[in-house]
Amino acid sequence: MYLALRQAVLRRAGLAAALVAGAITVTGAADWPEWRGPSRDGHSTETNLPGKWSPKGENLAWRIPIGSRSSPVVFGNRIYLNTPTGDPANTQERLVALEAETGKIVWERRFSLYLSDVPQHRSSWASPSVDPETGNIYLFTVAAQLVCLAPDGKVLWNRSLPDEYGAVTTHGGRTTSPIIEGDKVILNALILAWGDLNRTGNRYFAFDKKTGQTIWIASPQTRHYDTNYSTPIVGTIDGTRALLVGGTDGAYHALKLNTGERLWSLDVSKRAILNSPLFRDNVAYLTHGEENMDTTEMGMIAAVDATGSGLLTTDAFKWRTRGFLPTFASPVADAERLYTVDNSAIVGAFDLKTGAKLWEKTLGTLQKGSPVLADGKLYVGTENGKFYILRPSATGVEVLDEDVLGTPQAPEVIVASPIIADGRVYVTSMDALYAIGKRVPRASRVAPMAPAPMAPAATAVVQVFPYESLLTPGQTVSLKARLFDGKGNFIREEPAAQWTVEQLTGAVDAKGTYTASPAGSTAGVVKATVGAISGTARVRVIEPLPWAWDFEAAVAEAPPAWWTGAPGKVFQRTIEGAGKVLMRPRDDTVGRRSKVFFGQPNLSGYTVEADVRGREQRRQRGDVGLINERYGLVLFGNGQKLELHPWQAADEMTARVPFIWDAETWYRMKLRVDHLADGSARVRGKVWPAAEAEPAAWTIEKIDKIPHQMGSPGIYADGISDVYFDNLKVYKSQ
């Protein structure tokens, strides 16, 4: 009934074409469908919220022993929480659906993690998001897998960004929470893909929320410092619906929502931006806790005129206050003041018009979560395990309630931000989820819509949809040319576009249907031209197994164009005694641990083989390996061992044996995955000197009880020294 009312409202309003209308958000008055709430600013309009409670019972509705480092979301009578589960040998991320009234588990779905550098204790980093139109839930795992689930928990579609885009995950675990806006689900990830995405960097993705197809990919950054988890917010800037987000380059960026084009960028920090901005009335409020770009001072809180364009300068600041360090927490604001919490759990208040610091109060010593503002109160938890309810004013702050979760000797760490829904405050520690206050379900309502777009002007952008396709020989894809004006307003789909192909075999007809050639693999773009304006879609065509590369026919250094994660990392070179090979040179830059994928993400039942060789440089030896269905077989140079794992950072999930190998000798590696009748997988690896006959016995083996069912084949190298590959083969297992 709850969801049906929303859908009926949409139909009556004639808002099915969400693309035309821009962003339309329809929620219940008390829903909290995304990490920062229905308005994406950490603010709730609810009243009569609890000002006092106790973990021992007062105003405590329930507590369940399911914790997380991410915040839950609430939609209707369901709470959705991303949480780790399983012992260290079988850790997974799981999405749990809870009954809001009681905390009872309604359903859960588990996701095995793969090929990630994120350690187990940092899994379940990102909050899920709910689409108010359909009730579908979106989850982005620390393995960089985006999953769409129906309200009953059925998986509708998923995108594996490592296989498809060479997504890189790191030890820090930083993973962005997706947002749903109109017909799009939007997130960012660090990737190295193929074609024009041939540089390691942070990219912003818009996927069709119903199908998972790629709408656009934006690359506003020119450099990369570190990973981040700044979740985008949405605002209307002079009639342009825009995303505002902090980048891994130390800049804030504003992008056109419908096209991904950059409106402006503003450099503010010498490290990645981790928190999210605020936006009101063409003013963006930006914060960070690192060294400033133009001074050696640390930390910044600023108000910026968001109506600019291009690369903004310091002239864009309406005011700027330095010296307060909110690295992790995102700000909140009422009509007069901005509130945020620094790294040391000091909450501060700043005048919204001038930036002047009004007061500060120490809450603890460590801070990760963001505050939430509602009913004239600030709700904030600290990493020291204390949860506060505060009443701020212009002159100071009153502590209404202060509680320790757990015990003073063993406090429950609070990393997640609190949320508010249906009269309750929900607090998540690493150990438990608390529901505070009496639940008061509210009547559904339609939230204020985004301002109606201006009448479309002349065509400024041709967007080809879907933006990315992966085909087999002879397969077709129907492409559409979408026209947008200079403010990102949708005009129409253009039936008379002129279609051409570039770097691709195959052909495209006058209606935009591309047909791949009947044989061979290729990669390139299909271009649509309307007048003097063109747009492109990226297309890869990969032939069925078997594949074999000995690299002898190579005429250029670059590897095959359809390989993902290869540009700038691996090169076809000639070396003495071996002829032409594939080389991963020594590399100290971002993405030193390189994974290169060369197949479809849904492949299974195959074997990968290759000759490999290392090299000692500066008394260091790199690592080299193969990838099969999201399992890695890796020879460690310095460690002189062989490992077999689905998730390298998960030590208890890794099989390993000592293996002495010479840096100047070629070895043959072989990796095979077999799916067994009991639902488990037998993963086996073999290594032997390439000049010798293949031994009958496997060198290493692992039985995985939470197996991966599919994944692209690939190669792996840790570039602390040169490593080499030759005679690479992928074929169906017999």
Describe these PLM feature segments.
Residues 576-578, 584-652:
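Secretory/extracellular carbohydrate-interaction modules
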Residues 551, 608-610, 665-677, 683-687:
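Short tryptophan-centered beta-strand motifs in secreted/extracellular beta-sheet-rich domains
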Residues 443-486, 534-546:
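Short S/T/G/P-enriched beta-strand
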Residues 694-724:
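Flexible glycan-contacting loops in extracellular carbohydrate-active proteins
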Residues 648-670:
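Short, aromatic/His-centered strand-loop micro-motif at the edge of beta-sheets
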Residues 54, 556-581, 589-592:
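Extracellular glycan-recognition surfaces and repeat-rich motifs
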Residues 24, 28-463, 480:
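Noncatalytic, solvent-exposed loop/strand surfaces
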Residues 30-34, 538-566:
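Extracellular carbohydrate-recognition regions
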